[in-house]
Amino acid sequence: MKKYFLTIVLILAAFGCKAQISYNQYFNNDRLRLDLVFAGTNKQQRVYLESIHHEGAWSGTRSQMVSPFDYGNYEVALYSVADGAKIYSNSFCSLFSEWRTTQESKEVAKAFTNSVVIPCPKEKVKVVLSERLFETGKMSPLFTFTLDPEDKEIKRDSENDFKVDEILNNGPSEHKVDLVFAAEGYTAEEMDKFRRDVQRFVGYLFDIEPYKSRKADFNIWAVESVSVESGTDIPHNDIWKNTVAASNFYTFKIDRYLTAPDHKKVAQMVTNAPYDAIYVIVNTEKYGGGGIYNYYGLSMSDHPYTKEVFVHEFGHSFAGLGDEYYESDVAYEDTYNLNYEPWEPNLTTFVGGEYKWKGMVNAKTPIPTPNEAKYAGVVGVFEGGGYSAKRIYRPSFDCRMKTNKAPGFCPVCTDAINRMIDYYCR
């Protein structure tokens, strides 16, 4: 009887565990960049392959090739043509997916560039790009093609000669989070300022937990991407600058929303750098920024709230954290399907009384938790978040993902950041 029971346990364990993908079996040391174009409206979208570029060494994880996170609005996955195995996946969001929630997307079709990096396979692979369906909350295939690493049309030309500075090196990239800062709106004469700004941003990052305790898990790089003119576009003030990333305020007609709409330009800027995460420092005193998961983070260089905005936007772009505020103006409409759980680790729709961080809540904490200052510092379920005052909930009374006044991240966001760092480092 004991032998029979042990056999059953072993069988169940085998089916419950995912086989680890051997990096060296399927991939070489290089990185490929897929330049894509996403086009459509709020109701439909299509993806087109523009070009493939051979870049430097792959700097991402080599131990968890299939991402453990069900994050983002899109997933890119690689399947071996030889044996059918799923050998790589990662997820991301995009400015295009945000635009599809605006009023404009109901009136006109638009196209946005989107570049995705993958490890270079040794043999042919099937590339499957999936979208998260609003109706179900699940991923569904959107675009597929076969990639042959021996294809002579894969570009190998140098796209720029921007200098890459090593700011902090704590070890091999495959065991670290490689964060690259890129200059936007800095002329050649302003590169000394950019280097000082990078050092300041690095100080901001490691001044707050959990990054402060995890500094040894990061490598930091800086790309001296030179612009012809200083600053950035401010369209509603009729200010236009010739800059390397073509960034601008007034994205989706929101004054503070600072982005670089042409994602391909940003990808080209950092083509010679190792990176897991990209952060663009924009040379301006005007308040604004943006952060999009596994896409980029971007914000102003010289404002009294530069530190707070940087840490907030990096929370979006690196850890997939959602916005916990609900009172500021945004252009989005119907961002979340309230019948399903949001993918962001710090938001919940509380359907059926379920929520992601239940294990972190004290049994004496009332659920839902009243929005009262006496519950500050308590992990709970507070109504209001994700741009909506009703039916979307956040885990804390205040947090860096809610306001610039919060002293730091709440325990739920801290846990999510730590898990993302672990993914890249372990």
Task: For every predicted segment, state its role.
Residues M1-S22:
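Bacterial Sec-dependent N-terminal signal peptides
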Residues F27-K152:
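Beta-strand-enriched, solvent-exposed domains that form extended recognition/catalytic surfaces
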Residues V76, K307-E324:
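Active-site recognition of the HExxH zinc-binding catalytic motif
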Residues E153-Y211, A222-T232:
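Fold-level signature of zinc-dependent metallopeptidase catalytic domains
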Residues G185-A188, V226-S230, T284-G288, P304-T306, ...:
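Solvent-exposed loop/turn segments at secondary-structure junctions
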Residues M191-F194, G289-E313:
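Short pre-active-site segment immediately N-terminal to the catalytic Zn-binding motif
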Residues D217-Y293:
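Active-site-proximal segments of metallohydrolase catalytic domains
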